[in-house]
């Protein structure tokens, strides 16, 4: 997930965008932290009623919206250079993490199991295909899990890369919104014509790009302060989110399930993301100490996304050895992953900074 930094291009005071003294967008980091927290809760198997139900309404769209808010192409930067930067940011973690997990389970299951010749080709295919399954949820035929080495959350990285690729291509075109709408129509038609899920979420990328565009539009409107300065707008976002989310039903974007309507869920995801951002902006003013914790987590959503399932395996095993109950085990999995992987993320940043040569 892209770091919550924003270049002020409108000659406005940074506080009008919700920037703190370090140039961070704390409410944006809060939104990403809330999104990754719901990811952890869902993947740990937590069932918290309305919390996980409504959390499931925004926890993936909010990352697309946040990425759209921070989207920019530097003046004079070529499309190829832009794509290369996004590939380094998203595809290197994707293939690096996937390769690590594949090697780990190949050694664990095959080498130590006495069958080193078994190269887990199905797992390699899943890594290249980058979808949890080939057919939409509910498909009655054979539909095996493709990303089966605890790498299932990583589908998001390839999808976001293609969203950047598509939006970067159309962003400078005068008929950008026509192309955006046309792409959305293709996604919707594909969804209702065939249950086939294409590699790298190709059939869904134009759909996800609408969430991305909603993030950029929020920036054009003046940022989250536009919603918090007029309380009626913030309340309207919340009410639309709660009502439309109730009507939408459960979703699972990784499996191509959008609830009762793809278009309805677009509104749910956008209003839900805006609502979480408003809450973050309010907390920033009223509970700065709490926001500092969320900011720490929100800046490290990439390592948490990539490795939490792997860490879950060890935490769950350890909890079983200690005889912990189901509820306490899930708590250990969620909290332990947040603490350990946030620390890992900052440790990795520190090492990289030490490697960089000092500027003269």
PLM features: what roles do these ranges have?
Residues 1-360:
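Alpha-helical transmembrane segments and their immediate juxtamembrane cytosolic regions
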């Amino acid at each position: 997930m892209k770091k919550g930094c924003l270049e002020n291009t409108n000659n406005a005071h940074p506080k009008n965008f919700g920037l703190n003294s370090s140039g961070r967008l704390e409410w944006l980091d809060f939104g990403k932290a809330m999104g990754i927290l719901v990811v952890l809760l869902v993947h740990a198997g937590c069932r918290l009623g309305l919390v996980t139900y409504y959390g499931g309404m925004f926890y993936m769209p909010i990352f697309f919206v946040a990425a759209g808010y921070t989207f920019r192409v530097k003046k004079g930067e070529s499309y190829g250079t832009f794509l290369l930067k996004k590939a380094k940011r998203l595809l290197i973690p994707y293939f690096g993490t996937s390769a690590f997990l594949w090697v780990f389970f190949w050694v664990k299951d095959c080498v130590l199991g006495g069958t080193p010749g078994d190269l887990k080709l199905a797992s390699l295919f899943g890594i290249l295909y980058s979808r949890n399954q080939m057919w939409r949820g509910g498909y009655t035929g054979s539909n095996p899990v493709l990303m089966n080495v605890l790498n299932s959350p990583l589908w998001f990285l390839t999808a976001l890369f293609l969203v950047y690729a598509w939006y970067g291509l159309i962003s400078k075109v005068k008929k950008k919104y026509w192309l955006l709408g046309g792409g959305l129509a293709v996604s919707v038609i594909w969804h209702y014509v065939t249950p086939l899920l294409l590699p790298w979420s190709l059939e869904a990328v134009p759909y996800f790009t609408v969430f991305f565009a909603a993030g950029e539009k929020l920036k054009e409107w003046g940022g989250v302060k536009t919603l918090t300065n007029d309380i009626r707008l913030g309340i309207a976002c919340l009410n639309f989110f709660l009502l439309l989310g109730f009507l939408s039903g459960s979703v699972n974007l990784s499996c191509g399930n959008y609830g009762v309507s793809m278009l309805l869920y677009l509104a749910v995801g956008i209003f839900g993301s805006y609502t979480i951002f408003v809450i973050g902006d309010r907390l920033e003013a009223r509970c700065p100490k709490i926001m500092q914790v969320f900011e720490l987590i929100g800046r490290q959503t990439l390592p948490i996304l990539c490795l939490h399932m792997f860490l879950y395996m060890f935490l769950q095993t350890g909890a079983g050895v200690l005889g912990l109950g189901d509820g306490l085990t899930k708590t250990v999995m969620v909290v332990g992953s947040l603490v350990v992987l946030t620390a890992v993320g900052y440790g990795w940043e520190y090492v990289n900074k030490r490697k960089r040569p000092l500027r003269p």
